[in-house]
Amino acid sequence: MASSSCLKQGSVPMNNVCVTPEATYEAVVADPRLFMTSLERLHSLLGTKFMVPIIGGRDLDLHKLFVEVTSRGGINKILNERRWKEVTATFVFPPTATNASYVLRKYYFSLLNNYEQIYFFRSNGQIPPDSMQSPSARPCFIQGAIRPSQELQALTFTPQPKINTAEFLGGSLAGSNVVGVIDGKFESGYLVTVTIGSEQLKGVLYQLLPQNTVSYQTPQQSHGVLPNTLNISANPQGVAGGVTKRRRRRKKSEIKRRDPDHPKPNRSGYNFFFAEQHARLKPLHPGKDRDISRMIGELWNKLNEDEKLIYQGKAMEDKERYRTEMEDYREKKKNGQLISNAVPLQQRLPEQNVDMAEADLPIDEVEEDDEEGDSSGSSGESEPHDDQSIETDPELEEPSLNPSGPNLNPNPTEIVVAPKEKNGDVVMETSPLKKADEPTVAVTAEQN
């Protein structure tokens, strides 16, 4: 049977697309080859892409999908009655196809929805009631892309109110130039300043996406054309009405830390049972904490009342312990014995702030004196192997430490050994780090 088409470029309603079915509904159901031939020709006339989908490594049987859907009254009736699972159950998919139900529905709307309208309803002289009620329910063909309006109709939502800018500003500014400036950006849109004529407005530019709708993008929308759902609102509260807020996770720094001296909360009977079973099952099932928790919950539900009393008794003892410790904790806190937010004492060595005596001795004489190895008996200087030797190099000088631990004296002093002068005397000076008015003690040792 010959077919005719009145398809034109652009968005054309279904009533303006004249497609005569090549065969009856019973004929295409009985003959899969006739079905595939007529389906390919329909997509060719409409200018839409056609290809057999592959799910789980296998070609999808479009003929079977069409028969299963139309035998139940069509896709709209199935979705309204929520019987799509019946259609999915007739197919056998591999385990890797986890979203088979969604994929089947997606391919039906893109490949078989128009075929159903022409061969199933019009062949029988039936027009879907939804198509007669509103023109928006009719499928539209936009330059080779199908808009699945039937699926959008099945998903209902409440439209958000829009602000008519011309009515808001008055009819005198309807033809004025509009200049917009983006002041800031946030997760769901932009903060903008719009100048219309002599009026300046501040608001929010955001995209309204209802939670239960499926958005479809046409090629025209991908080339800088703003969708019709973009609104300029004079009230920033419009963002909350159109965009679902995300739940913000609190940072660790925002969580109030518990007092370390606070008693450990009491545990329930299940907590004791969980700790006991977790220690037993963890070596048997490494890396499966979630499964272990599920198994422990099942084991707890299988316990009788007498077995649970054992753990509930432990819980009562722990509750009494918590009550006693809390009373003691409150009493200490009341008397001021607890130091909250206590930190360990930070100790560090004092900074080096010493006055080095300058040596007038030439370099040659210093080297000669070093070779002689002269030392004074009163200074206690001995061989370098002795632990009590005094180094003469000021760069290797370190502060003296208390043998029993760090020196906590707030005004420590340091022993400074100056290089040998011409007369061979050793000058030892003690200079305070903080108090400048204390006397300086000098010890002079004459050379033997």
Curated annotation (Swiss-Prot):
Annotated ARID domain residues: 29-120
Biased composition (Polar residues): 219-236
Any Gene Ontology biological process: pollen germination
Keywords noted in UniProt: DNA-binding, Nucleus, Transcription, Transcription regulation
Family in the record: Belongs to the HMGB family.
Gene: HMGB15
Keyword DNA-binding (UniProt): yes
Basic residues bias locations: 244-255
Superkingdom per UniProt: Eukaryota
Pfam families listed in its UniProt record: ARID (PF01388), HMG_box (PF00505)
Protein name: High mobility group B protein 15
